[in-house]
Amino acid sequence: HHDDIPLGIMPYINFQVSKPNNELHFSVLTSGFNAVTNAYVIKSLYNTLDFITAGEVQMLQMENYFEAGFNDWWGKDVSHFLDGVSEKNQYEKERGLAHRLVRIVTEIYHPKSEEEVVEKIKEIIVDLEETYPGSVNSPDVQKLKGMIREFEEELVWGHYGIPVSNVHHLRLGFYKGKIFTEQPEKNRDIVPILDQFRQYQPTMISLVMDPEGSGPDTHYKVLQAIAGAVKEWSKEKDLSHVKIMGYRNVWFRYHPAEADIIVPVTLNDLHILQNSFEESYITQVDASFPSYEYDGTFSDVAQKTWVNQMRQIQLVLGKDYFIFNKSHLLKATHGMIYTKMLTVNQFIEIAEQLESIMEGITEIGDL
């Protein structure tokens, strides 16, 4: 899901990005449109109309924009927005978002002129203004909302120079605009993941692994879809070298005894998390009640979790272990991330056990 990776293992990503031989790919399996409010889209589309009227979306004047040009240089929108971040220029950030929204509208609705773009944006605004908050949007509006979240994901990894070609948006079909979504299906939800494994040949796969019986939510269904793809991939080649990293973020935590690898978190890591989250996940900064434990942003909740986990480790090792450590990294550590490293067989076994538990819960609920 969008923002799960940074909220779970951003400091570990910081370490991996620094290795020049690593090739990183970030796959977001769900559209995430449910997390984008009508009010946010309305405001952003009004801003986009203002930029078009002021002649500030020059790409609309490209000779072949409406035929194919709109589909070129999606990464320019990311660079444009992040230039605004570096300059602390809100106007340019909003203009960068406007460029992306114009591309999105062009891809979904296929307008043939600037005038048709403007008319379509106005139609979407009217539709959303007449829609009761929380009701199910049309498939086109769901796609538009989802593509806004996809832009956010490209922004956060753009901080590292990761190109948009390495940020993959799978939009798996089980994720729908309903409270209870469908179970993953092989051809619809598992094969797209398997195709990515075949193409990129990863040696490490990371995902959220929430505890057993935590509920048939998005994390659980994504886990089952990934497990299905890994299982199919294991039939095609030897995966003994592949590692699966499980992590948790703002909803659940590992007990220290469950963790196989504990990642140190520095103040620099915390700054990167906070800044990139607030500047990238623009629809989520004001998310209501992200946690029952803390009334703040998701990134605040993640930071609080990592700091609390540091205190747990200090109870075992003592504060002096870090204060007087010869390692600059450990001396600078102010948080900890717990992760679980698994072989492919271990991961598949855990997924199957979790599936059996959930089937049992469903059967009890049907009694």
Describe the predicted segments one by one.
Residues 20-24:
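A generic structural motif
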